[in-house]
Amino acid sequence: MNREDPGPHVAADDPASIDREALATLNRVFGYPAFRGPQASIVAHVAGGGDALVLMPTGGGKSLCYQIPALLRRGVGVVISPLIALMQDQVDALRELGVRAAFLNSSLGARAAAAVERAVVAGDIDLLYVAPERLLTPRCLELLDGVRLALFAIDEAHCVSQWGHDFRPEYLQLTVLHERWPQVPRIALTATADAMTRGEIVERLALQSARQFVSSF
């Protein structure tokens, strides 16, 4: 599918339309016949403008939980990911499907990064993957100030836990997303978070109003 057409852009207050377009996007873009487990509920909640915390095992289809809402909502979906290699793999896979995806991280030279920034401003990107340290730069924050934002997805959200092996201090600063863009929905995702870590994610990312979706392992 060619994503030059920016997609259906459903109304947040029309649950039936969201459900219908979400399933159509799953079929048409990603080639799956049906959602699995809580995916449909998560997609509908975030596409409708709600915040979410998603705990789902690796291989459970976490990525679709933010990719589809990003395609349904107007603007660019911004995905914060700490893993450069995974970022590249996700963007490559999305481009193969015809989704307009790009990334900003330290692997890009200045010219390549500027080209991505121009594409974002032009409205030519549906999903932008950003390393947390890049997101927090004044240049990137100002870039996002100038465009319409569909959502923020915070992947590997357990990196916010100061007690965990994967702690990333930049994640503690991601409250800026809510402070700077309070109307933009946020979805935090992780495959490894016990109840204590989930509480820490909620507190440190200011997700007190987020609906929690906890899948069994």
Per-region residue spans from a language model:
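ASCE RecA-like P-loop NTPase motor cores
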Residues: 2-12, 44, 96, 123-125, ...
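Conserved pre-motif I regulatory segment
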Residues: 10-57
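Conserved nucleic-acid-binding Ia/Ib motif block in the N-terminal RecA-like helicase ATPase lobe
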Residues: 23, 77-79, 84-137, 200, ...
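Pre-Walker A (Motif I) flank of P-loop NTPase domains
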Residues: 48-54, 75-76, 124-126, 185
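Walker A/P-loop
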Residues: 49-68, 78-81, 190
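Conserved hydrophobic packing residues within short motifs/helices of P-loop NTPase cores
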Residues: 55, 78, 102, 151-153, ...
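Conserved helix/coil segment N-terminal to the catalytic DExD/H
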Residues: 60-63, 67, 108-151, 159-165
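Post-DEXD/H (motif II) to motif III coupling segment of the RecA-like Helicase ATP-binding lobe
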Residues: 145-215
